[in-house]
């Protein structure tokens, strides 16, 4: 079934059918006649034809660093909610925190017909920025502050600062820290700097406390905690850069006969599902990941509709969750 055939059956011009399909100006009488024929014939416009007419594919590219992380499903839920309402398809790619793979994905989306790209970024290298600059569509960054593109992110620095201040408030003087790679400006560098500032205010030098690095997983958190214990240093409180790392650290401590929070007070950050199913519940910081997905989707649609729209930077709030582990 073609537009010409629909037009002939409805007794209107092909141009009238095209205006109907694109929500253009049309008399109510013609609109009703066309709608009746479309319903009777179960006509579905060709996606290719629609793209040729509107120059829009109704497809959005999305890249996430780790599909099974605590944050990615929430971000995707927010994006999907908005895109479903606007009849957009989401083309999802998962880089598994592999930088070379992520760069290849950007190259793929350069060659694909998408109306916009949402990048949930953990690292933004010069190669990332070069490839993003070659995109022929709007770009929105989630999870990192970025001057070059519209972005949605959390205040990792302030959240980490507040949590470390809380851990030290009860008289603890032997803190430790398990972070992630500081090339990740949000979870790595800014959380580290927030902790460092809180320690400085307590007259503790960050470089003198036991520190380890993990890679966002429970197992790596467990291994990092084991390395901290092997130093023999006294630790009475521990800040972990993610909830999953914190759960791994707690698992290790229990295997070594230590109790949380009686022996060591522990906090994470992010407030994923694991924080609340743990016993006792994990002290953490609630980040609004679903909201970040909603906001990113709205920003990309705004830029698709108005390519000249100014870039926007949106920092979301957070909520301290003082629960059972600290």
Q: Predicted segment positions?
A:
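N-terminal helix-turn-helix DNA-binding module of bacterial transcription factors
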Residues: 1-58
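Periplasmic-binding protein-like
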Residues: 114-120, 176-179, 211, 232-242, ...
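Flexible loop/turn connectors
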Residues: 226, 230-326
């Amino acid at each position: 079934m073609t537009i010409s055939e629909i037009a002939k059956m409805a007794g209107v011009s092909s141009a009238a059918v095209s205006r109907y399909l694109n929500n253009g100006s049309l008399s109510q009488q013609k609109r009703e006649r066309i709608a009746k024929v479309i319903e009777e014939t179960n006509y579905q416009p060709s996606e290719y034809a629609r793209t040729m007419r509107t120059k829009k594919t109704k497809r959005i590219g999305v890249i996430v660093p780790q599909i099974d992380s605590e944050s990615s499903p929430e971000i995707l839920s927010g994006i999907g909610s908005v895109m479903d309402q606007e009849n957009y398809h989401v083309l999802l790619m998962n880089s598994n925190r592999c930088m070379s793979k992520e760069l290849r994905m950007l190259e793929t989306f350069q060659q694909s017909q998408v109306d916009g790209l949402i990048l949930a970024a953990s690292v933004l290298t010069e190669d990332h920025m070069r490839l993003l600059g070659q995109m022929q569509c709007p770009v929105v960054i989630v999870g990192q502050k970025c001057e070059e593109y519209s972005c949605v992110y959390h205040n990792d620095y302030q959240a980490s600062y507040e949590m470390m201040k809380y851990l030290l408030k009860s008289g603890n003087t032997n803190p430790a820290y398990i972070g992630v790679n500081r090339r990740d400006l949000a979870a790595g560098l800014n959380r580290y700097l927030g902790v460092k500032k809180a320690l400085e205010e307590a007259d503790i030098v960050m470089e003198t406390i036991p520190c380890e690095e993990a890679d966002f997983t429970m197992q790596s958190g467990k291994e990092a905690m084991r390395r901290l214990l092997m130093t023999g240093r006294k630790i009475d409180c521990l800040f972990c850069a993610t909830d999953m790392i914190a759960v791994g650290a707690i698992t290790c401590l229990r295997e070594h006969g230590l109790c949380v929070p009686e022996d060591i007070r522990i906090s994470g950050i992010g407030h994923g599902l694991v924080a609340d199913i743990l016993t006792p519940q994990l002290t953490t910081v609630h980040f609004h990941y679903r909201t970040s997905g909603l906001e990113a989707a709205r920003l990309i649609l705004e830029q698709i509709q108005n390519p000249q729209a100014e870039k926007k930077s949106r920092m979301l709030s957070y909520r301290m969750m003082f629960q059972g582990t600290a």
